[in-house]
C-alpha cells in the first residue's frame, strides 16, 4: 500500500513538472508580415524601379550598338557596356541584400518584443509548426507599424 501511494505521488509530481516545463511557442508567417510591412513594400518598389531602369539601360545600349558602323567600334562598345552593366547589376544586388537585411532585422526586433510581451519561450516560422503554438504574425505587424 505504501509503495502504491508513493508511486501515485511520484507520478502526480512528474506530471506537474512536465506541465511547468511546457514551452509557449509563437510562430509567424514571414511572408504575411513582409507583405503588410510598409518599409518592405517601399523597398520592393525601389528594387523593382532599379531593375526596370537596368532593363531600359540595356534597351538603350542595344539601340546605340545597332547604330555603330565598324566592327572595332562595336567591340569597344561591347566591352564598355559589359563593364557598365556588371557594375550596375552588382550595385542592384548589393542594394537588394542591404534592404533584405534591414527588413529582416526590423522584423526580428519586433518579433523579439512580441516574444517578451506575450511571455513566449520561442518564435519560429509557421512552416515549422505542425500542431499547436500561437500565431503572432498580426502582433508583429502591429509592432512594426508602431516602431516606424
Role assignments for model-derived ranges:
Residues 16-22:
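Sec/Tat signal peptide C-region and signal peptidase I cleavage site
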Residues 8-16:
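Bacterial N-terminal signal peptides
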Residues 1-4:
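Positively charged n-region of N-terminal signal peptides that target proteins for export
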Residues 23-148:
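Amphipathic, charged alpha-helical segments and their helix-to-coil junctions
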Amino acid at each position: 500500500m505504501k509503495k502504491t501511494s508513493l508511486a501515485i505521488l511520484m507520478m502526480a509530481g512528474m506530471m506537474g513538472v512536465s506541465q511547468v516545463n511546457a514551452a509557449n511557442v509563437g510562430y509567424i508567417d514571414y511572408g504575411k508580415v513582409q507583405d503588410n510591412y510598409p518599409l518592405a513594400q517601399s523597398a520592393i518598389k525601389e528594387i523593382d524601379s532599379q531593375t526596370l531602369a537596368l532593363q531600359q539601360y540595356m534597351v538603350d545600349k542595344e539601340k546605340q550598338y545597332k547604330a555603330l558602323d565598324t566592327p572595332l567600334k562595336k567591340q569597344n562598345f561591347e566591352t564598355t557596356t559589359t563593364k557598365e552593366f556588371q557594375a550596375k547589376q552588382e550595385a542592384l544586388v548589393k542594394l537588394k541584400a542591404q534592404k533584405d537585411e534591414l527588413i529582416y532585422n526590423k522584423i526580428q526586433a519586433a518579433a523579439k518584443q512580441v516574444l517578451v510581451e506575450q511571455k513566449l519561450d520561442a518564435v519560429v516560422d509557421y512552416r515549422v509548426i505542425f500542431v499547436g503554438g500561437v500565431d503572432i504574425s498580426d502582433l508583429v505587424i502591429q509592432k512594426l507599424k508602431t516602431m516606424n
